[in-house]
Amino acid sequence: VGSLYLTEIRPLQELGTNFANVLGAVTKAKEILDIPVYQGGSDFPENHDIELRSVRFSYKVNGSEGAREGGLGRDGKTDVLQGVNLKIRDGERMALVGRSGAGKSTIIELVSRFYDVQEGEVLIGGRNVKELDYDTILKNVAIVFQKTFLTRDSVLENIRMGSSASLEEVRAAAKEAQIDDFIMSLPDGYDTKVGSFGSRFSGGEKQRIAIARAILKNAPILILDEATSASDPENQMEIDKAIQNLCKGKTVIVVAHRLSALKLCDRVAVVENHTITSVGTHEEVRRKNAYYRKAWEDYEKARNITYRLEGGAGNA
C-alpha cells in the first residue's frame, strides 16, 4: 500500500495542488488584466495646487469598473470619504492627520488617481485628474511610502528606477538624501547588490534610498505617506534633513501619525468621521479641533516623560 501511495496516488495529489495554484495565478492575472486603461491627456498643468471638491468615495466593487472602484479586497459597505473639500495651494505643505482608517491614505490615492471618485472632483491646477492619463500623473507626482520596496538589483538601479540618470546625477540625489556616505561605504559602492527586499539595510537606510529616488525624479507634487515611520534615533536627523531637501519648491501632502513630522508643514487638515473637519495652521487647528488638541496634549506628555527619564538616567 505504501509503495502504491508513493508511486500512484501521491503524484495525483501533487498534481491537484499544482492545478489549484495555477487557477489562483490565473485569477490574479485576470484581476490585473481587468483593470481599466486610464484615459486622459498628457498636458500637465503648470500650476500645482490641489483641490478636492465635495468628494465621496468608497471601495465598492462595481461590475465593469472593478478595480477602479475598489476591487482590492476592501468591503465597500460604507463610504470612506463623504463631502470632502480641501484646497492645497501651489508650493504649500499640507499635513493630513487623523486616526488609523480615517481616510488619509485614501485622499492621496485619489490625488494620485489610483482610484476615481464616485462623486465630486479631484483637481490639479484646476484640471480634473480624470482628464490626465496615468503616465502623466506618474511623472509629475512622487510618493515616498511608509514601507520602501527595494528590488534585487544594485543600489544604483534601485535609486534610478528605470530612468536614464547618470551616476553623477544619482549621487547628487543621494547626497541630498543623506545616504551617499553610507552607499560609498558598501563593498561595491553603488554597484552593491541589494538583498531580498533590502534585507541588508535598516529601515532608515531604505527610507533615505526612497527619498533619493524622489529627489532624482524631481516631480512638482510630492506625497509623503508616513515617510518617517521607519526612522530611529540614530538616523532621525539625517531623514529630517533629507525630507527638507526633498520638499523644496514642491506642493507637498504629508500623511503622518508622528506629530513631530508636522513641523515640516504650513497647514494641517484633520480627517475624521469620513470627512475633513478642520483646516488651518497648527495653532488654529489646535484651538478649534478637540481630536487634534488631545493628540498634541498626549504627545507632549509622552515627550516630557521621556525627557525626565533620560535626565534621571543621566543623573544616576
Residue map of PLM features:
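Cytosolic ends of transmembrane helices, especially the final helix of ABC transmembrane type-1 domains
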Residues: 5-32
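Residue-level detector of secondary-structure boundary/capping sites
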Residues: 20, 43-46
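Coiled-coil segment of the histidine kinase dimerization/signal-transmission module
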Residues: 32-35, 161
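Two-component histidine kinase transmitter core
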Residues: 35-36, 115
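Active-site phosphate-binding and catalytic loops of NTP-dependent enzymes
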Residues: 38-40
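ABC-type nucleotide-binding domain
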Residues: 45-316
